[in-house]
Amino acid sequence: MAISTPMLVTFCVYIFGMILIGFIAWRSTKNFDDYILGGRSLGPFVTALSAGASDMSGWLLMGLPGAVFLSGISESWIAIGLTLGAWINWKLVAGRLRVHTEYNNNALTLPDYFTGRFEDKSRILRIISALVILLFFTIYCASGIVAGARLFESTFGMSYETALWAGAAATILYTFIGGFLAVSWTDTVQASLMIFALILTPVIVIISVGGFGDSLEVIKQKSIENVDMLKGLNFVAIISLMGWGLGYFGQPHILARFMAADSHHSIVHARRISMTWMILCLAGAVAVGFFGIAYFNEHPAVAGAVNQNAERVFIELAQILFNPWIAGILLSAILAAVMSTLSCQLLVCSSAITEDLYKAFLRKQASQKELVWVGRVMVLVVALVAIALAANPENRVLGLVSYAWAGFGAAFGPVVLFSVMWSRMTRNGALAGMIIGALTVIVWKQFGWLGLYEIIPGFIFGSIGIVVFSLLGKAPSAAMQKRFADADAHYHSAPPSRLQEG
């Protein structure tokens, strides 16, 4: 469908607004701490929505609705698993990680935190974790660029190659300029846009088909299996879909939001906001795909694009059902989802190179200004590599994301979880858990044993590795155990009263 002038104007205004926020954030970025973690100044609202937006990539508006459109409501198991995993992550990890990173050399990155938490003088933990971030996040960034390119290709009628660069340019620019504050502030705007799109679209789809009851009847008539939660699924398949929730414990771009909160006490409010946002967005995404079945069954003349590529179901519904101004806003939500996640991932990759490799091994005495500019250059370098990986237009967003999600979940998830919950954990345990988790994902992905999603064996074997190697070796030093105890006591301390705050 050809792009209209109102849609073009809406897109341009949106993109310009994101870049403007980047320039505003640039004025608040005074040092590398500001560029990477925003000076740990995020309040609960920004923490919540930026964590949500950075988590839900283009997959939320393309991959998930497309999967439900193809297979029916049974694909919603993945949304249930994600919701449970996110809630547990907020409950167990978020506040603790905020405190423990501060107690361990005021760590700015996960590799930096692991090095301080386990007194790793060899710095092998820093190297391995930084390399794991670069490997899996480059794949993750590529998936975001593919999603953005598809949007530009479909909406503007561009060639895929042109769309590839157009879709990534604005994100790279505001991330390059403004760093973490730009990313977090734009994430908040983008999260608001995403929830608006995912609530409005399924409501209009249902109305256009004749109401909820009529829509459900049409879906059942096409195939009764569309409303069967267990359609074609055995125990392994359900566990694999639910297993996506395990990934939350190890996603650096989400964990960075916890680390950047202004206080661990504000995490409680952030959790409530974030989980409400997440449940509404996931329900909306499932509803788009589910009721999209009814709409395109009733209107087969316009179903050609979604029958060719189910991931376009949201795009097609937005363009068909809404006037061009509203359609432009709704399609901007896909760009918002892509940009919010891509910008966070670019920044995490940049920080891994700058803080954990460049500063740690090449320029220990580098000035803050130098580190900020190295960080900016690394944003460009990682983006170019990701664009090269995304050059094949046949890539499937869900497939790429599932691999990267599993990689982080298994390599970092058990290490992060045990590091904030178990004082007996050692450097060797962390190293074993990281290596075993990552290797299990890579090997399991290649062989596809039992049809089980690779994050599950990766998480299990990684956790076992942590416990076994921690107990086999020497106990943590007295200083390490005291630091853990102090951080844990701080985490459990009561929040200041209003009188104390005032």
Question: Which role does the model predict for each range below?
Answer:
Residues 1-502:
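Membrane-embedded helix-loop-helix hairpins and adjacent transmembrane boundary segments
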